């Protein structure tokens, strides 16, 4: 792991080396000129999927951090700087690395960057993470098919492992769970750990689960996904084992 500074930019890479193109790695235009953009996804901003296996060992997802809500209309992507380790991209990078090393199915963090403004008070942030191949989020799948009982149980066990590490996924919803088709089995992944972190006690865990259930119920009406109380019962039974 290598952390370094170039002018007003700070980088961390999951490699023991410095890259000359460090700045360009976080610019979508660079990858477009290289003809290495292999897809994209729209959310608060655009996440770009990149063909980088020959450079980083895996293909990557490039994401810029944007604010949401009313405040995001006034200030779309600047955050107040206090310490490097608490910036949005560095904090998510370190959390993903911890979970990855603990064996949880999360994207491997590849690199993160922050760029301070002229006064050094605010910063903008970006992150490169592993692209999970051959995967879809649950809502996309559940629009066209039901999932077997074992898949719901796998999701429950995964969330339990996360909670046992005292990590709260503050945006735990059906869109942030991916299902990957790997040979003859399906594997669940958790993504998007922005603003997530360690939380003491147990009081929040049931609330976190309920948040996930509400997201499924919301998408039943909005996207007509196939989700039943039995699906939820299978998930929670595995969680409580």
Swiss-Prot record:
GO molecular function: ATP binding; protein serine/threonine kinase activity
Pfam families given in the database record: Kdo (PF06293)
Catalytic reaction equation(s): an alpha-Kdo-(2->6)-lipid IVA + ATP = a 4-O-phospho-alpha-Kdo-(2->6)-lipid IVA + ADP + H(+)
UniProt keywords, alphabetically: ATP-binding, Cell inner membrane, Cell membrane, Kinase, Lipopolysaccharide biosynthesis, Membrane, Nucleotide-binding, Transferase
Biological pathway: Bacterial outer membrane biogenesis; LPS core biosynthesis
Gene3D superfamilies, sorted: Transferase(Phosphotransferase) domain 1 (1.10.510.10)
Predominant localisation class: membrane
Record's GO cellular component terms: cytosol; plasma membrane
Record keyword Repressor present: no
Topology within the bilayer: Peripheral membrane protein
Subcellular location: Cell inner membrane
EC number: 2.7.1.166
Active site: 171
Alphabetical GO biological process terms: lipopolysaccharide core region biosynthetic process
Alphabetized NCBIfam families for the sequence: PRK01723.1
Cross-referenced HAMAP family: KDO_kinase
Similarity section: Belongs to the protein kinase superfamily. KdkA/RfaP family.
Function comment: Catalyzes the ATP-dependent phosphorylation of the 3-deoxy-D-manno-octulosonic acid (Kdo) residue in Kdo-lipid IV(A) at the 4-OH position.
Name of the molecule in the record: 3-deoxy-D-manno-octulosonic acid kinase
Gene name of the record: kdkA
């Amino acid at each position: 792991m290598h952390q370094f500074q170039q002018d007003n930019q700070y980088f961390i890479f999951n490699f023991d080396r410095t890259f000359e193109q460090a700045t360009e790695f976080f610019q979508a235009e660079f990858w477009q000129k290289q003809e290495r953009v292999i897809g994209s996804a729209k959310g608060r901003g655009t996440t770009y999927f990149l063909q980088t296996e020959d450079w980083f060992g895996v293909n990557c997802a490039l994401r810029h951090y944007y604010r949401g809500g009313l405040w995001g209309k006034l200030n779309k992507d600047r955050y107040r700087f206090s310490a490097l380790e608490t910036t949005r991209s560095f904090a998510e990078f370190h959390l993903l690395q911890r979970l990855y090393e603990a064996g949880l199915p999360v994207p491997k963090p590849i690199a993160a960057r922050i760029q301070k403004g002229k006064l050094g008070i605010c910063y903008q942030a970006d992150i490169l993470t592993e692209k999970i191949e051959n995967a879809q989020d649950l809502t996309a799948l559940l629009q066209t098919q039901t999932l077997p009982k074992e898949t719901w149980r796998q999701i429950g066990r995964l969330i339990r492992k996360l909670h046992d590490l005292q990590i709260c996924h503050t945006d735990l919803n059906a869109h942030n769970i991916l299902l990957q088709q790997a040979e003859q089995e399906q594997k669940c992944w958790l993504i998007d750990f922005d603003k997530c972190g360690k939380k003491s006690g147990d009081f929040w865990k049931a609330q976190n689960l309920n948040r996930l259930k509400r997201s499924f119920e919301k998408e039943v009406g909005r996207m007509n996904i196939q989700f039943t109380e039995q699906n939820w019962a299978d998930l929670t039974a595995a969680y409580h084992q």
